[in-house]
Amino acid sequence: MAGKRHFDTPFNLYHLSEENHDGQLFEPRSMDKMRVMEGENWKTPRICVSSSNDGAVSAVVDSMSYPTGLKLWVHVPQNLLELFSSNKVYKPSLRQVPDSETTGEHWLKAPALMKVIGQIEVIDVDYSANLYYMWDGEKTRMDRFNWKWTVHFFRN
């Protein structure tokens, strides 16, 4: 379904979770300082989303130990058009999130009603994807993961 829009918005934004949050209203929140990468802004209240499942998987599992078989529910904000029109979708700077260009991370700065569009399973690390970002003046490698849909719903 690459490139297909789930709602009438400029592009898709995805949020991954080990739990199914279908129909739940997410509120922006500050991050736990221990769960963000070094140098990442943890104080700004937000809901983290990515412009691609690849980026979202890299952002979520980068801090874990290569979770082969990990299943993640894929959510999209059902009120994304409203969030765009009210300027509540924010692209963090590299200073705020050093790997944001690689992961496609965006922040939702207002409540978002989540809709599950499926579930994916992490298969393995894609060592051929040479992804890098700059951190503290140094080129830092980031892993990309192969994954597959285990359940996929397409809903408008």
Q: Residue ranges of each PLM-predicted region?
A:
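Conserved NAD+-utilizing ADP-ribose enzyme module
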Residues: A2-F11, E38-I47, N53-N156
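Short, hydrophobic/glycine-enriched beta-strand segments
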Residues: N12-E18
